[in-house]
Curated annotation (Swiss-Prot):
[4Fe-4S] cluster binds at C347, C407, C410. It catalyses: (2R,3S)-3-isopropylmalate = (2S)-2-isopropylmalate. Pathway: Amino-acid biosynthesis; L-leucine biosynthesis; L-leucine from 3-methyl-2-oxobutanoate: step 2/4. This is 3-isopropylmalate dehydratase large subunit. Belongs to the aconitase/IPM isomerase family. LeuC type 1 subfamily. Pfam families: Aconitase. Disulfide bonds: none annotated. Heterodimer of LeuC and LeuD. One of its GO terms (molecular function) is 4 iron, 4 sulfur cluster binding. SUPFAM superfamilies: Aconitase iron-sulfur domain (SSF53732). GO terms for biological process: L-leucine biosynthetic process. Its cofactor is [4Fe-4S] cluster. It is an enzyme of class 4 (lyase).
C-alpha cells in the first residue's frame, strides 16, 4: 500500500524540476487573480517584455474594492474605479477571462471559483490572497501568494516552493446543533495556536470532517492559514463529486467518469504516513468566539476571557495587549458583551448555506435597536439563489440590510467600515487591530448563526439559547 498522502501525490504530479537550492519548481494548474494584487504583477510583466504563459489557466474576478450598496459605474471612490478599470484592461490585453460585475458570475474569488467548478481535486491553485487555502476543500493544494509570485505565475505558470510537512487533523464525533464548521476551525486554531501550523499542510479527516458539506469544508480550509498552515485540504469523496457534477467548468460525459476515478485515487490511503497527527472530538465543541486580536484567542460562548494564570507564559504579553485593546477584563464572561455592528459575509462564510443558517435565526425576529446589521452574499450566484429562496426578504423583515456581493467589511478596502471604537460580530476570518477599517475598531469572529443571534440580542449570545421566535 502507498504511504503517500494526497499532498504528496499532488506535489509529485506538479513537480517541474528540483532546483539547486533544494526548492521545487511547481506547476500551477489554476491561477486566480483579482484587482488588488494583480496590477503590479502585470506592470512588471510588461517591463520585462514577457507575456502571460497560460491565459486559459488564469481566471479573474473583482471583489476586494467593490462597494456593496451600489455598484453603478463609475464608482464614487476614484481609486477603486481605477483598480477595476486596470483589471479590465489587463484581462482584455492578455486574453484572460474576467467574471466582472453584472456577469452573473462575479464574486469573492474563493466563492466564485468553486461554484463555477473551476476548483477540482488534484489541482494546484494559486492566488494573490491569503485565504486561497479555501480550495483545499476539494482535495486541491492551494496557496496564497504575494504580488511578485503573481508575476511569476503569470509568466511561467509555476512557483518556486519548498515542500511542506503534513499534519493530519483528525476529528471524531459529530458537531452538535448550533455548532458549525466556523466553530470547529476556531477551536482548532485556539488549541494549536496561530503559529502551530507553520511549515505544515493540514489534512482534515475523520468522521466529523466527512459529515461536513462542501461549503462547510471550504470554511474549514479557508482558515487553515490563520492557524499558520500554508494550506489545508480534505480528501475528495462523494460529497465532493456531488457538488462538482454539472457545474460549468466540471468535466461531463465520459470525461466525468474518468475524472472521478482519478480523483478517488488521490486520497490519502489507510497506510499514509503523516509527519504529525492531532485528534479532536467534535461533540465537545461549543459555539466559539474570538475575544482578542488574533484568531487564536478564542473561547466557547459559555466561557470567560482567560486570565493570565490560564494563559501559557509565552502568550501572556499578547493577552495583556488584547485586554487593553478590546477593553475586556480577565475572567469576564463573553456572553452578554454588547456589539454595535453585525456583518454576515466574506470568503469564509458568505455562501448559500451560511445565509440559510443566519436566516433561520433571523426569521420572525427583529434586529435590536441601535444595531447595524447587514448581509453581503459572497457572489452574484449566491445572491440570486438566496433571493430565489426568499432569504433576502427574511433578512430585510428582521431589520438587516441586504447588500451586493463583495468582500465588504472583512477587510475594509471598500466603503464598509467600522467607526471609532465600534465592536463587530463578524463571520469573517481575521480580528487583527484595525482589520475592519477603524484603527481602534474591535472584531469578534463567530459563525453566521451566532452573528445573527448577536444582531437580534444586541450582544453576544448563545444561538442555542434564543427564545422561540
Amino acid at each position: 500500500m502507498s504511504t503517500a498522502t494526497l499532498y504528496d501525490k499532488v506535489w509529485a504530479l506538479h513537480q517541474v524540476a528540483e532546483l539547486p537550492s533544494g526548492s521545487t519548481q511547481l506547476f500551477i494548474g489554476l491561477h486566480l487573480i483579482h484587482e488588488v494584487t494583480s496590477p503590479q504583477a502585470f506592470a512588471a510583466l510588461k517591463d520585462l517584455g514577457l507575456s502571460v504563459r497560460h491565459p486559459e489557466r488564469t481566471v479573474a474576478t473583482v471583489d476586494h474594492i467593490v462597494p456593496t450598496t451600489s455598484q453603478a459605474r463609475p464608482f464614487a471612490d476614484g481609486l477603486a474605479e481605477e483598480m477595476l478599470s486596470t483589471l479590465e484592461r489587463n484581462c482584455h490585453e492578455n486574453g484572460i477571462h474576467l467574471n466582472g460585475l453584472g456577469s452573473g458570475r462575479q464574486g469573492i474569488v474563493h466563492v466564485m471559483a468553486p461554484e463555477l467548478g473551476l476548483t477540482q481535486p488534484g489541482m494546484t491553485v494559486a492566488c494573490g490572497d491569503s485565504h486561497t487555502s479555501t480550495h483545499g476543500a476539494f482535495g486541491a493544494i492551494a496557496f496564497g501568494i504575494g504580488t511578485s509570485q503573481v508575476r511569476d505565475v503569470l509568466a511561467s505558470q509555476s512557483l518556486t516552493m519548498n515542500k511542506l510537512k503534513v499534519r493530519r487533523i483528525w476529528v471524531d464525533g459529530a458537531l452538535q446543533p448550533g455548532v458549525f464548521a466556523k466553530d470547529l476551525v476556531l477551536h482548532i486554531i485556539r488549541t494549536l495556536g496561530v503559529k502551530g501550523g507553520v511549515g505544515y499542510a493540514y489534512e482534515f479527516a475523520g468522521p466529523a470532517i466527512e459529515a461536513l458539506s462542501m461549503e462547510e469544508r471550504m470554511t474549514l480550509c479557508n482558515m487553515a492559514i490563520e492557524g499558520g498552515a500554508r494550506c489545508g485540504y480534505v480528501n475528495p469523496d462523494q460529497t465532493t463529486f456531488d457538488y462538482l457534477k454539472g457545474r460549468p467548468h466540471a468535466p461531463s460525459g465520459d470525461a466525468w467518469d474518468h475524472a472521478v476515478s482519478w480523483w478517488k485515487s488521490l486520497a490519502s490511503g489507510a497506510d499514509a504516513c503523516f509527519d504529525d497527527e492531532v485528534k479532536f472530538d467534535a461533540a465537545v465543541i461549543a459555539p466559539t468566539i474570538t475575544w482578542g486580536i488574533t484568531p487564536g484567542q478564542g473561547i466557547g460562548v459559555d466561557e470567560a476571557v482567560p486570565t493570565l494564570e490560564q494563559t501559557p507564559e509565552e502568550d501572556r504579553p499578547l493577552a495583556q495587549e488584547a485586554y487593553r485593546y478590546m477593553d475586556l477584563q480577565p475572567g469576564q464572561a463573553i456572553a452578554g458583551l454588547p456589539v454595535d455592528v453585525c456583518f454576515i459575509g466574506s470568503c469564509t462564510n458568505g455562501r448559500l448555506s451560511d445565509l440559510r443558517a443566519a436566516a433561520a435565526v433571523a426569521a420572525g425576529r427583529q434586529v435590536a435597536s441601535g444595531i447595524k446589521a447587514f448581509v453581503v452574499p459572497g457572489s452574484e450566484q449566491v445572491a440570486a439563489a438566496a433571493e430565489a429562496e426568499g432569504l433576502d426578504a427574511v433578512f430585510r423583515q428582521a431589520g438587516f440590510e441586504w447588500r451586493e456581493p463583495g468582500c465588504s467589511m472583512c477587510l475594509a478596502m471598500n466603503p464598509d467600515r467600522l467607526e471609532g471604537r465600534q465592536i463587530s460580530a463578524s463571520s469573517s476570518n481575521r480580528n487583527f487591530k484595525g482589520r475592519q477599517g477603524s484603527a481602534s475598531g474591535r472584531t469578534l469572529l463567530m459563525s453566521p448563526a451566532m452573528v445573527a443571534a448577536a444582531a437580534i440580542a444586541g450582544r453576544v449570545t448563545d444561538v442555542r439559547s434564543l427564545p422561540p421566535a
